[in-house]
């Protein structure tokens, strides 16, 4: 869905155009931006700049604060891990937002993810499942982050452990994630995450520098 912002001169701009000018601080545009946040949750899209603009408008206009939109922005930022979007969003929260019980729950979930305690995360996610039920693709976005961590941590991993880290998924879904990440079943309940040939190898790099490139610099040193 295309969101257009109505300007005072009667013209319309896209949200991206509006965010590039002083109009991003106009509270008259907040409702349009909040609707855009809701569309991101529904359609599995993501716009960090627009979401941060909403939080900034809440800072300037605390009487317009919408907690449901705040929750959605924070949860959407979690889907962007390992990027630091959540930290940036958290830094824009007002004291009354920080004191909110649901905000604290989301912050706790973020802390659990950042320390890679994925088993605990899925347990807490199940308890709080209604919080992000409206966010399309939330679970798979977290599984993508889990896969990133697994890929940088393991060379081989037990299949049952991998299944647990990905949220206790079905065997068929597990096979789909193994294939998606380019991993391979080794047999005996093991999954190869990184092949021996994929290990980082040192490489000597020789760069040819012409005398003309450094001649002027050498002359200054004489």
Swiss-Prot record:
GO CC, one annotated term: eukaryotic 43S preinitiation complex
InterPro entries: ARM-type_fold, CSN8_PSD8_EIF3K, eIF3k, PCI_dom, Transl_init_fac_sub12_N_euk, WH-like_DNA-bd_sf, WH_DNA-bd_sf
PCI domain: residues covered: 46-208
Compartments reported by the entry: Cytoplasm
A single GO molecular function term of this UniProt record: translation initiation factor activity
Signal peptide: none
Main location class: cytoplasm
Complex formation: Component of the eukaryotic translation initiation factor 3 (eIF-3) complex. The eIF-3 complex interacts with pix.
Function: Component of the eukaryotic translation initiation factor 3 (eIF-3) complex, which is involved in protein synthesis of a specialized repertoire of mRNAs and, together with other initiation factors, stimulates binding of mRNA and methionyl-tRNAi to the 40S ribosome. The eIF-3 complex specifically targets and initiates translation of a subset of mRNAs involved in cell proliferation.
Family recorded in the similarity comment: Belongs to the eIF-3 subunit K family.
Name by which UniProt lists this protein: Eukaryotic translation initiation factor 3 subunit K
Top-level taxonomy: Eukaryota, Metazoa, Ecdysozoa, Arthropoda, Hexapoda
């Amino acid at each position: 869905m295309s969101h257009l912002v109505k300007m005072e001169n009667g013209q319309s701009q896209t949200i991206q155009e509006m965010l590039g000018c002083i109009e991003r601080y106009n509270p008259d545009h907040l409702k349009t931006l909040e609707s855009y946040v809701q569309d991101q949750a529904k359609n599995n899209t993501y716009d960090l700049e627009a979401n941060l603009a909403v939080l900034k408008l809440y800072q300037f206009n605390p009487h317009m604060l919408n907690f449901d939109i705040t929750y959605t922005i924070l949860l959407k930022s979690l889907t962007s891990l390992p990027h630091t979007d959540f930290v940036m969003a958290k830094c824009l929260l007002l004291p009354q937002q920080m004191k909110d019980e649901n905000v604290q729950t989301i912050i706790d979930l973020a802390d659990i993810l950042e320390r890679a305690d994925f088993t605990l995360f899925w347990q807490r996610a199940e308890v709080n499942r209604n919080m992000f039920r409206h966010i399309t693709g939330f679970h798979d976005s977290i599984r993508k982050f889990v896969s990133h961590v697994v890929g940088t941590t393991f060379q081989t991993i037990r299949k049952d452990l991998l299944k647990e880290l990905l949220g206790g998924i079905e065997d068929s879904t597990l096979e789909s994630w193994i294939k998606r990440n380019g991993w391979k079943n080794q047999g005996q309940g093991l999954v190869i995450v990184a092949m021996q040939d994929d290990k980082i190898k040192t490489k000597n790099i020789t760069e040819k520098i012409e005398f003309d490139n450094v001649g002027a610099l050498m002359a200054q040193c004489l």
